[in-house]
Amino acid sequence: MKLLNAAEGRWRLDYNCVANVLKDTEYDIIPAKKKEEREITEYLLWLGIILGKRDYLSFIRGITPAAMILLEKIVETLTEVGDIKKYCEKRKDTYWLTRNKLEQSEIGKEVLDVLDKRYGEFTDCIYTTAHLELIIKEFCSDDKIKSHYLKIIRKTETELRNPIAHTIVAVDNGMIKNRIGITAEELYNDVIKKVAESVRLMKKSTWNSYDEMNKLLIEKVREVK
């Protein structure tokens, strides 16, 4: 069944597969149409599916891309800094935050001052969530973002994701709550989802996208029988 093959491709984040399989059908299972928006939306939904399977190890290992997505959008939408890539040079497939780019605007100079204070003298590098954290703390006026969501996201990276990233270890909710103070489900539902909606990455209705796809699959399978 084409729809089943497309669903499997979606699970693998293979959008070309989905498009090719469904191109001559009436089905449309991916809500976001623009490439960047689609990649972000589908990744966050995929994390939720992983969590639903209680695959806590894969969920935590998948946090860094999600953290980067969320923090980039916080900087872009909730600070006057805007798109962090404006201050970067693209080198092959990576974005390097550079002094030269930062020095080209007043707000860039303010960002550079923050980075210099933290690192002694900031040197050009691929930007990370650690850099975005500094920018958000300095330029974001949303106290809940700064004092709650940002803190949990970065704590998840530094105290949970990074230590287990390259080790063979069993991960359960007991470990997760012990290290970051909340369960994996609370992290996803009360932090990731809330931030994604706050920065207009996701609509509330989009979170049900996989459920809607699964209902459609069940309907079509029953029709075949």
Question: Locations of the language-model features?
Answer:
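Charged, helix-rich terminal subdomains or tails
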Residues: 14-16, 25-26, 106-110, 114, ...
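Charged alpha-helical initiation segments
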Residues: 1-56
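Charge-enriched, short contiguous segments at helix-coil
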Residues: 137-212
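Conserved non-transmembrane functional hotspots
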Residues: 211-223
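Amphipathic alpha-helical interface elements
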Residues: 33-129
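Regulatory/sensor and coupling segments of signal-transduction and defense proteins
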Residues: 78, 124-125, 129-139, 159-160
